[in-house]
Amino acid sequence: MFEIIFIGVGGGAPNKRGLPGILIRREGFEILLDCGEGTQNKMIEHSISFMKLNLIGISHLHGDHVLGLPGIIQTMAMYSRQQKLLLMGPTTLQDYLKSSSKHTYFKPGFETEFIQSYEDQNLTITTFRTCHTIESYGFLIKEKDKTKVDAERLKKEGITDWRIIRKLKEGKRVEIDTKVFLPEDYLYVKKGLSIAYTGDTAPCDSVLNAIKGVDLLIHDSTFLNEREAHDYGHSNCTDAAEIASKADVKRLALYHISGRYQTTEPLLKEAKKIFERTFLPEPLSYFILQEE
């Protein structure tokens, strides 16, 4: 299960929807995707701890996605953070943070590590290229598949001995009173949940190929239906819906909405004509992604 807080959902100049920042939690591991100006202020105002963050991923170095990052790192240090902070993003991200630290005369008192991908016993986090006007990446967060025992079948057949169940889970065959129990008859694979976040992007094959079949796609939907959207390296809400449909994703969240729109209803309405399982999160809205 993933818990997702859409801290800011707008894009471009600061606006009432806030700038990009998405908090994703899974069993004590916390990820922040993008960190626009004002992200830490929103977190403080609504009692969302940034001290618990394990990893921050930055899609690209346009200001609305990254200007909040130096500030949140400095505040972490002021609050005496000791835990290492993992960072993922474009090749220029490290230079940006070094320059920011140098010219604000500040050095974090904790370790930061720049990584290209992340893996632990439960999760993998990887990036994929998106099609924006500068170097830019999307993020793919996936739970690992788990091998499970069919408890109902074992119960029906009267198998309750934990030693037998353990052997089956280990992939070993078990023989009891001449009856043979094969692991493949009692094991199944539980597919892990997955989230894809595009950051800013025009529609392109590299995005489509990376996000196929994800449970939740958070896609650039800057505009309603502007001819210039692709020239700016952005997508219309209808582009996002078409990609969601082609990629056979489970749910679509429209994201990075331009401040020019006073209401988001037309964007959601147009997208849902193409892909029904679409929603448009409000700033600071909370979403739980779990098995259906």
From Swiss-Prot:
The active site is at residue 64. It catalyses: Endonucleolytic cleavage of RNA, removing extra 3' nucleotides from tRNA precursor, generating 3' termini of tRNAs. A 3'-hydroxy group is left at the tRNA terminus and a 5'-phosphoryl group is left at the trailer molecule. It holds the Pfam family Lactamase_B_2. Its EC number is 3.1.26.11. Binds 2 Zn(2+) ions. It comes from the Archaea. Belongs to the RNase Z family. Homodimer. This is Ribonuclease Z. It comes from Sulfolobus acidocaldarius (strain ATCC 33909 / DSM 639 / JCM 8929 / NBRC 15157 / NCIMB 11770). The gene is rnz.
